[in-house]
């Protein structure tokens, strides 16, 4: 497989929010966009090994592995329970 072409296709499909992800996976709370979730799902579609350091609630981790035959490792110490996306203030 041409990896450069696969990366280009994964980026394109991610921008269009096209992937194998279901609404259940897309609804996992996280600090990322749907485009990134779709990109990760597409880039991992050829298998391999996926490592994520900082899993938080699993939004990107689950998006990457959903429907893909991939070996996956997720690491987190869960020391930051109140993470927020950049530019969003936490409401008390």
Predicted regions and their residues:
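Extracellular/lumenal glycan-associated surfaces
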Residues: 16
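Helix-loop module immediately N-terminal to the HCX5R catalytic loop
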Residues: 33
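Conserved P-loop NTPase mechanochemical-coupling segment
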Residues: 19
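S-adenosylmethionine/decaboxylated-SAM
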Residues: 4-6, 10, 23-29, 37-92
């Amino acid at each position: 497989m041409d990896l450069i072409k696969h990366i280009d296709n994964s980026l394109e499909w991610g921008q269009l929010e096209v992937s194998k992800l279901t609404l259940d996976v897309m609804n996992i709370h996280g600090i990322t966009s749907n485009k990134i979730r779709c990109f990760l799902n597409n880039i991992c579609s050829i298998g391999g090994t996926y490592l994520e350091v900082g899993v938080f609630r699993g939004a990107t981790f689950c998006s990457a592995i959903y429907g893909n035959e991939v070996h996956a490792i997720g690491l987190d110490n869960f020391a930051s329970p109140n993470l927020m996306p950049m530019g969003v203030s936490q409401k008390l």
